[in-house]
Curated annotation (Swiss-Prot):
Ranges spanned by the short sequence motif Nuclear localization signal, renumbered to the chain: 65-72
Residue ranges with Pro residues bias: 103-113
UniProt gene name: vpx
Primary location group: virion
Complex formation: Interacts with the P6 region of unprocessed GAG. Interacts with host VPRBP/DCAF1, leading to change substrate specificity of the CUL4A-DDB1 E3 ligase complex. Interacts with host NUP153.
Protein origin, superkingdom: Viruses
Organism whose genome encodes this protein: Human immunodeficiency virus type 2 subtype A (isolate BEN) (HIV-2)
Region (Binds to human NUP153): 61-80
Gene3D superfamilies per the UniProt record, alphabetical: 1.20.5.4730
Alphabetical GO biological process terms: symbiont-mediated suppression of host innate immune response; viral life cycle
Keyword Cell membrane: no
Protein name as catalogued: Protein Vpx
Segments for region (Disordered): 94-113
Length: 113
């Protein structure tokens, strides 16, 4: 009888698999941020990033990858809720709405250029 469990392809070690997961996390955050600016104010995106980093990394002592993962979860929930409530944005940039008199926007989180 053969073993039904998946096997790691030859030549792949745990290190490579973990590295691939970190690369996936980076790519996913960048893609989510690029889409989020079309639906959420840039200030909100920046604040979620900054507060996530401050709480999970600085206060709780979690790793950078864990902090990025928690940020990803929060942003996915925010985007889901936005669409669930009936998105009417259709690609308009939400970046400066309501910020005209508050000076330049803060620097964006990684991947949001």
């Amino acid at each position: 009888m053969t073993d039904p469990r998946e096997r790691v392809p030859p030549g792949n070690s745990g290190e490579e698999t973990i590295g691939e997961a970190f690369e996936w996390l980076e790519r996913t955050i960048e893609a989510l941020n690029r889409e989020a600016v079309n639906h959420l104010p840039r200030e909100l995106i920046f604040q979620v990033w900054q507060r996530s980093w401050r709480y999970w990394h600085d206060e709780q002592g979690m790793s950078a990858s864990y902090t990025k993962y928690r940020y990803l979860c929060l942003m996915q929930k925010a985007i889901f809720t936005h669409f669930k409530r009936g998105c009417t944005c259709w690609g308009e940039d939400m970046g400066r709405e309501g910020l005209e008199d508050q000076g330049p926007p803060p620097p964006p989180p990684p991947g949001l250029v």
